[in-house]
């Protein structure tokens, strides 16, 4: 996020807020995400970027004697139900560790272009790779370690751990 903010001239905290999303709430009546191959340009691009991250992380995990379990890409519009609860477009892209799925509202790409002046493939790929970073943190147990540390920490330290977690997901 920091590098992206420097590249685009945006406030890093504002970008963290948008990319990190908000809290999902459970709503059993929420629309379910469509399944199958994406048919629009943004969806096809997202699937291609995700496939590229799968290739890279599979190789990195293999070099460590482990196997990589890729997340599932879920494309949605307006709202979606996940194992982490229901999320609206306002949440932005998010990774749900409970179902190991990466949720992406394709309208978010338009928001990147219009609100943050970050149109194009780089910004879109960056967001997808960031969410995959959260998946890797979950697979390696880092997310659980950070959550445990946050529960023992004061508010300022817990927030600092959140920022570090977001920055690591960028890597």
Predicted features along the sequence, with ranges:
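A Zn2+-metalloprotease active-site environment signal
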Residues: 1-171
